């Protein structure tokens, strides 16, 4: 990724966090945290990695709410960030936090056994 793509990625992450927490009023939207945004070098596509707190059903409902609000989110990003073309976004669940917690739990269990 080039320098401009990195800058756009960080700005999108910040703005998406604000939009998801303050602007979208969908009750299906659970507790969502934007953990990262990967923007392609040509700024045409962006993968938005999110962490969702809750059950699998709540995660599924949150993804449905995000899919429904996709157009609104994209237009808000367009208003907040000056770009010629707003990247097409896809939302993916980031399981790295749960994975990290599991590793931490296993390490604690090992220390308690010793």
UniProtKB/Swiss-Prot annotation:
Its subcellular locations are: Cytoplasm
What superkingdom heads the lineage?
A: Bacteria
GO CC annotations, alphabetized: cytosol
- Enumerate the Gene3D superfamilies for this protein: 3.30.300.20
**What keywords are assigned to this protein?**
Cytoplasm, Ribosome biogenesis
Its GO biological process annotations read:
maturation of SSU-rRNA; ribosome biogenesis
Respond yes or no to whether keyword Cytoplasm is given for this record: yes
Q: Name one GO molecular function term.
A: ribosomal small subunit binding
Q: Which PANTHER family match?
A: RIBOSOME-BINDING FACTOR A, CHLOROPLASTIC-RELATED
The record's annotation in NCBIfam families points to: rbfA (TIGR00082)
As for family, the record states: Belongs to the RbfA family.
Q: How the protein assembles, per its UniProt entry?
A: Monomer. Binds 30S ribosomal subunits, but not 50S ribosomal subunits or 70S ribosomes.
List the HAMAP family: RbfA
Question: What is the documented function of this protein?
Answer: One of several proteins that assist in the late maturation steps of the functional core of the 30S ribosomal subunit. Associates with free 30S ribosomal subunits (but not with 30S subunits that are part of 70S ribosomes or polysomes). Required for efficient processing of 16S rRNA. May interact with the 5'-terminal helix region of 16S rRNA.
> What is this protein called in UniProt?
Ribosome-binding factor A
Source organism of this protein record: Listeria monocytogenes serovar 1/2a (strain ATCC BAA-679 / EGD-e)
- The gene that this protein is the product of is rbfA
């Amino acid at each position: 990724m080039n320098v401009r793509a990195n800058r756009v990625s960080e700005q999108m992450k910040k703005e998406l966090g604000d939009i998801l927490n303050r602007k979208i009023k969908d009750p299906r939207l659970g507790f969502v945290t934007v953990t990262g945004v990967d923007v392609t070098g040509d700024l045409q596509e962006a993968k938005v990695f999110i962490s969702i707190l809750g059950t699998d059903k709540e995660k599924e409902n949150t993804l449905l709410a995000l899919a429904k609000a996709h157009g609104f989110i994209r237009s808000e990003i367009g208003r907040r960030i000056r770009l010629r073309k707003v990247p097409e976004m896809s939302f993916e669940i980031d399981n790295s936090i749960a994975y990290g917690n599991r590793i931490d739990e296993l390490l604690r269990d090992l220390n308690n056994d010793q």
